[in-house]
Amino acid sequence: MSWVMVSPELVVAAAADLAGIGSAISSANAAAAVNTTGLLTAGADEVSTAIAALFGAQGQAYQAASAQAAAFYAQFVQALSAGGGAYAAAEAAAVSPLLAPINAQFVAATGRPLIGNGANGAPGTGANGGPGGWLIGNGGAGGSGAPGAGAGGNGGAGGLFGSGGAGGASTDVAGGAGGAGGAGGNAGMLFGAAGVGGVGGFSNGGATGGAGGAGGAGGLFGAGRERGSGGSGNLTGGAGGAGGNAGTLATGDGGAGGTGGASRSGGFGGAGGAGGDAGMFFGSGGSGGAGGISKSVGDSAAGGAGGAPGLIGNGGNGGNGGASTGGGDGGPGGAGGTGVLIGNGGNGGSGGTGATLGKAGIGGTGGVLLGLDGFTAPASTSPLHTLQQDVINMVNDPFQTLTGRPLIGNGANGTPGTGADGGAGGWLFGNGGNGGQGTIGGVNGGAGGAGGAGGILFGTGGTGGSGGPGATGLGGIGGAGGAALLFGSGGAGGSGGAGAVGGNGGAGGNAGALLGAAGAGGAGGAGAVGGNGGAGGNGGLFANGGAGGPGGFGSPAGAGGIGGAGGNGGLFGAGGTGGAGGGSTLAGGAGGAGGNGGLFGAGGTGGAGSHSTAAGVSGGAGGAGGDAGLLSLGASGGAGGSGGSSLTAAGVVGGIGGAGGLLFGSGGAGGSGGFSNSGNGGAGGAGGDAGLLVGSGGAGGAGASATGAATGGDGGAGGKSGAFGLGGDGGAGGATGLSGAFHIGGKGGVGGSAVLIGNGGNGGNGGNSGNAGKSGGAPGPSGAGGAGGLLLGENGLNGLM
């Protein structure tokens, strides 16, 4: 038996060399064509004319033969290049099955693979996301909570190299308390981003909003992640989740604390979450979350405390206290974190506006070697520390006068109730100041001030100020979070103010160019029409995009706000999770789209659509998953968000899964369709297509079942694979309704097709003819299996009826 050994790289390189040679010959022939095909006669006699015509004809014949040779040459080069690419792709495809038996042993022994991502928790179940592979893998996102105060699932932990999954959000359907958001998954033990905490559920007729989930902890060299915001409540808003702590060694900022949920009618806002602590050596503490707005005569909610820094880094700013619009006093600001060796103390949070301005939080003291105390820090009793502060202030004075910002130190907080912007941090290092809360008392609420930018070397951007409530008009827009520059996290966007139309949340600040987390978007304000959530900030070199803010609650006869889009990931970062749609007694808000991954990053998960409790009105559609980066190696597109449930109207469609990278990466799964209590079930979203070369198509989302005399939702189609990979399975159709309903089950989704080598995806099963054993109409048609690859692969199996 003879053996053939091929180096794909050498074949491709040889094809490129041959293409260059062919191009040079073609250029030479073209240059000679003018002088060889149209010769001038030497004289006017017949002999000269005949000689010129003879040589011209020979030149034309040569050019025709050269054109045929060039076409053959081009075909040869193309075949050689395609052969090299096919060898390379075949090698990549042959390597993939070798991992399956290795992973199977790890799964059997430990419950998680060696390499691979954890599965997402199913939407509407509150299931936890699966952990990523021990070596490489991202944790799965927690499932959104079940209707009726179900808590969101926790995100799965990342592997040694990998990011934690996002915690699941929760939204209520009927009267009752909102469910708590799930905790974000911890990052990989070495590198990777922690998962963002889930948003607490709105109370839709109940008293209390759900608490936001805590942000995940960073890995050994990673930053903590921002937390979930508390949900708004009829009486009491949910507390914001605590920011995640950074990794134990080296670098990493603490995650920002969550914003407390607002009270919608005569109660108290939720307290802001505490900022997470930074890594041991380098990193700034996370900013505390702002307190939620209260509508009671009592004191409003307090802002969260800022986190502790590393040996080098700034203490986190305290969160602003919540405002009171019911005649009560403003909430106290959170305390700033204290510097350790080199770094400023965090600013104390500003007190909230109200009948009496809330007390400002206590500022943190600066580092022992170098650092300025945060604003509102107590007077020092140490002569040495006092001398240090005096010297730094003397150095800062000319910089402050000439440029409006100090050399070392934090920017000042914007004055509460004015919507003033926070000051920028020092030119060398310092946190940006928090934006001031918007004005209160007018027809329209005032916009919140923008957070100040962080210091050039290191520093966290300030949190945007909350928008002021509008008496009968528009709620104020939340201020944008301040951006970090080199090392540092972006500030969270401020929440929108309540009004007849809720104000939109502010955009999160961008992460530092080198290290740091992006800021989350602010929550939309409540109103007859809820405000839209703010977009998450964009990540830096290694950072994920910030999560989009949740949409505002729409009450009593308006629509919920749209969730904010997740921010785009940095070069190696994943896209941020889209914000959940705002709850409503009428039309639920749509989920925000997941952010796109950086050049090498995965796409973000789309936000879940919110539920609707009004007859004849649909819930919000699920947000689309973000696309993976163009050159992502194995990273997937983000999963689409699930559609919100409806009372009597037809369920809404789930979000479309994000596409894989340009060459590599699998498509994201489609979101499940929205459930309907008596209307047709919503269709599942289509799975995303894989990268062109290697990757599997995303699975289609499941169609939702119907409980009344209605038709189940169709399953989403599976995504198309790359040249080497499996087509995505089609989603299952939803079941029909109760006894006596002469409707059919939902149609199963069509399986995705493979391209060159790989099996087609299986078609989805048709929906059952009746739920829970009830007799109903006909079962739904099954989905057809996808076509197998042209060179090697089987067609997918058709779904069952």
From Swiss-Prot:
PE domain boundaries: 1-93
SUPFAM superfamilies noted in UniProt: PE/PPE dimer-like
InterPro entries: PE-PGRS_N
Keywords of this entry: Repeat
Highest taxon, organism lineage: Bacteria
Similarity comment: Belongs to the mycobacterial PE family. PGRS subfamily.
Protein name as it appears in the record: Uncharacterized PE-PGRS family protein PE_PGRS10
Higher taxonomy: Bacteria, Bacillati, Actinomycetota, Actinomycetes, Mycobacteriales
